[in-house]
Protein backbone atom coordinates (compact mmCIF):
# COMPACT_ATOMS: atom_id res chain seq x y z
CA UNK A 1 0.00 0.00 0.00
CA UNK A 2 1.38 3.37 -0.91
CA UNK A 3 1.86 6.26 1.46
CA UNK A 4 -0.80 8.24 -0.41
CA UNK A 5 -3.34 5.41 -0.15
CA UNK A 6 -2.65 5.06 3.59
CA UNK A 7 -3.23 8.77 4.14
CA UNK A 8 -6.46 8.63 2.15
CA UNK A 9 -7.76 5.69 4.23
CA UNK A 10 -6.89 7.49 7.48
CA UNK A 11 -8.64 10.65 6.25
CA UNK A 12 -11.76 8.65 5.33
CA UNK A 13 -11.78 6.92 8.73
CA UNK A 14 -11.52 10.27 10.55
CA UNK A 15 -14.34 11.75 8.44
CA UNK A 16 -16.58 8.75 9.16
CA UNK A 17 -15.93 9.10 12.91
CA UNK A 18 -16.66 12.84 12.83
CA UNK A 19 -19.86 12.30 10.84
CA UNK A 20 -20.93 9.59 13.28
CA UNK A 21 -20.29 11.90 16.25
CA UNK A 22 -22.19 14.73 14.53
CA UNK A 23 -25.18 12.48 13.81
CA UNK A 24 -25.10 11.21 17.39
CA UNK A 25 -25.16 14.70 18.91
CA UNK A 26 -27.93 15.69 16.50
CA UNK A 27 -29.91 12.55 17.40
CA UNK A 28 -29.70 13.24 21.13
CA UNK A 29 -30.59 16.92 20.56
CA UNK A 30 -33.60 15.97 18.42
CA UNK A 31 -34.90 13.60 21.11
CA UNK A 32 -34.30 16.25 23.78
CA UNK A 33 -36.35 18.67 21.67
CA UNK A 34 -39.19 16.11 21.66
CA UNK A 35 -38.85 15.88 25.44
CA UNK A 36 -39.18 19.67 25.72
CA UNK A 37 -42.09 19.76 23.26
CA UNK A 38 -43.92 17.16 25.35
CA UNK A 39 -43.52 19.36 28.43
CA UNK A 40 -44.64 22.52 26.62
CA UNK A 41 -47.69 20.85 25.04
CA UNK A 42 -48.78 19.02 28.18
CA UNK A 43 -48.14 15.57 26.67
CA UNK A 44 -47.06 14.17 30.02
CA UNK A 45 -47.29 10.51 28.96
CA UNK A 46 -44.68 11.19 26.25
CA UNK A 47 -42.58 13.21 28.68
CA UNK A 48 -42.53 10.27 31.10
CA UNK A 49 -41.50 7.91 28.26
CA UNK A 50 -38.50 10.16 27.59
CA UNK A 51 -37.56 10.51 31.27
CA UNK A 52 -34.73 8.45 32.74
CA UNK A 53 -36.49 5.42 34.34
CA UNK A 54 -34.92 5.83 37.79
CA UNK A 55 -36.43 9.34 38.03
CA UNK A 56 -39.87 7.95 37.16
CA UNK A 57 -39.39 5.25 39.79
CA UNK A 58 -38.27 7.77 42.44
CA UNK A 59 -41.40 9.86 41.83
CA UNK A 60 -43.62 6.82 42.34
CA UNK A 61 -44.12 5.41 38.86
CA UNK A 62 -45.56 6.48 35.53
CA UNK A 63 -49.10 7.35 36.66
CA UNK A 64 -47.96 9.29 39.71
CA UNK A 65 -45.46 11.29 37.63
CA UNK A 66 -48.13 12.14 35.04
CA UNK A 67 -50.49 13.26 37.80
CA UNK A 68 -47.74 15.33 39.47
CA UNK A 69 -46.95 17.06 36.17
CA UNK A 70 -50.64 17.68 35.45
CA UNK A 71 -51.23 19.18 38.91
CA UNK A 72 -48.13 21.35 38.59
CA UNK A 73 -49.38 22.70 35.25
CA UNK A 74 -52.84 23.42 36.70
CA UNK A 75 -51.24 25.21 39.65
CA UNK A 76 -49.16 27.35 37.29
CA UNK A 77 -52.29 28.27 35.27
CA UNK A 78 -54.15 29.17 38.46
CA UNK A 79 -51.37 31.65 39.23
CA UNK A 80 -51.35 33.13 35.72
CA UNK A 81 -48.28 31.27 34.49
CA UNK A 82 -47.64 28.79 31.69
CA UNK A 83 -44.65 27.19 30.01
CA UNK A 84 -44.24 28.84 26.61
CA UNK A 85 -41.48 26.60 25.33
CA UNK A 86 -38.02 25.19 25.79
CA UNK A 87 -35.09 25.27 23.38
CA UNK A 88 -32.40 22.63 23.65
CA UNK A 89 -28.90 22.91 22.17
CA UNK A 90 -26.60 20.11 21.04
CA UNK A 91 -24.28 18.63 23.64
CA UNK A 92 -20.61 19.60 23.53
CA UNK A 93 -19.62 15.96 23.91
CA UNK A 94 -20.97 12.47 24.43
CA UNK A 95 -19.04 10.39 26.98
CA UNK A 96 -19.15 6.59 27.09
CA UNK A 97 -18.82 4.72 30.39
CA UNK A 98 -19.18 0.96 29.99
CA UNK A 99 -22.39 0.33 28.03
CA UNK A 100 -23.84 3.76 28.78
CA UNK A 101 -23.44 7.11 27.10
CA UNK A 102 -23.96 10.48 28.77
CA UNK A 103 -24.33 14.04 27.52
CA UNK A 104 -25.29 17.43 28.90
CA UNK A 105 -27.59 19.54 26.75
CA UNK A 106 -27.96 23.27 27.49
CA UNK A 107 -31.59 24.37 27.65
CA UNK A 108 -33.51 27.65 27.80
CA UNK A 109 -37.07 27.59 29.15
CA UNK A 110 -39.54 30.45 28.72
CA UNK A 111 -42.43 30.80 31.16
CA UNK A 112 -45.25 33.33 30.92
CA UNK A 113 -45.78 34.99 34.30
CA UNK A 114 -48.14 37.85 35.23
CA UNK A 115 -45.30 40.42 34.96
CA UNK A 116 -43.91 39.23 31.60
CA UNK A 117 -41.80 36.30 30.45
CA UNK A 118 -39.32 34.51 32.65
CA UNK A 119 -36.31 33.10 30.78
CA UNK A 120 -34.38 30.42 32.61
CA UNK A 121 -31.26 28.61 31.46
CA UNK A 122 -30.63 25.07 32.59
CA UNK A 123 -29.67 21.71 31.19
CA UNK A 124 -30.78 18.17 30.57
CA UNK A 125 -28.65 15.12 31.25
CA UNK A 126 -29.09 12.56 28.48
CA UNK A 127 -28.48 8.86 29.12
CA UNK A 128 -28.34 6.07 26.53
CA UNK A 129 -28.06 2.42 27.45
CA UNK A 130 -28.01 1.13 23.85
CA UNK A 131 -25.03 2.93 22.29
CA UNK A 132 -26.97 6.05 21.34
CA UNK A 133 -29.96 4.48 19.60
CA UNK A 134 -32.38 5.77 22.24
CA UNK A 135 -31.96 8.37 24.98
CA UNK A 136 -33.77 9.30 28.17
CA UNK A 137 -33.46 12.60 30.00
CA UNK A 138 -33.12 14.11 33.45
CA UNK A 139 -33.88 17.78 34.10
CA UNK A 140 -30.78 19.26 35.69
CA UNK A 141 -32.67 21.68 37.97
CA UNK A 142 -31.65 20.93 41.55
CA UNK A 143 -29.90 17.72 40.53
CA UNK A 144 -26.40 18.37 41.89
CA UNK A 145 -27.33 17.18 45.37
CA UNK A 146 -28.91 13.93 44.12
CA UNK A 147 -26.69 13.14 41.13
CA UNK A 148 -24.73 10.37 42.90
CA UNK A 149 -28.00 8.75 43.98
CA UNK A 150 -29.63 8.94 40.55
CA UNK A 151 -26.56 8.26 38.37
CA UNK A 152 -23.70 6.86 40.45
CA UNK A 153 -21.70 6.10 37.28
CA UNK A 154 -22.03 9.66 35.88
CA UNK A 155 -18.67 10.55 34.30
CA UNK A 156 -16.77 13.17 36.34
CA UNK A 157 -15.35 14.77 33.17
CA UNK A 158 -18.86 16.00 32.30
CA UNK A 159 -19.18 19.07 34.49
CA UNK A 160 -22.67 20.23 35.38
CA UNK A 161 -23.23 23.86 34.39
CA UNK A 162 -23.64 26.35 37.24
CA UNK A 163 -27.16 27.36 38.15
CA UNK A 164 -28.13 30.77 36.78
CA UNK A 165 -30.82 33.12 38.03
CA UNK A 166 -33.89 33.41 35.77
CA UNK A 167 -34.26 36.68 33.87
CA UNK A 168 -37.60 38.51 33.75
CA UNK A 169 -38.48 40.13 30.45
CA UNK A 170 -41.19 42.64 31.45
CA UNK A 171 -44.39 43.05 29.42
Task: Annotate the PLM regions.
Residues 41-44, 114:
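Alpha-helix boundary/capping and short turn/kink residues
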Residues 15-18, 22-23, 67, 161-171:
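Compositionally biased, proline/threonine/alanine/serine-rich low-complexity intrinsically disordered stretches
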Residues 13, 51-54, 72, 154-158:
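Alpha-helix boundary/capping residues
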Residues 40, 77-81, 162:
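Residue-level signal for secondary-structure boundary elements
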Residues 1-8:
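Bacterial N-terminal signal peptides that target proteins for export
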Amino acid sequence: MTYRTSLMLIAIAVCVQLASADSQTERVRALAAKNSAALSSGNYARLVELTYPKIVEMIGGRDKMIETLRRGSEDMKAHGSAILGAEVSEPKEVVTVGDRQFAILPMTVRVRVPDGTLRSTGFLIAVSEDHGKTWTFIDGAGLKEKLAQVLPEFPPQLLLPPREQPVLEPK
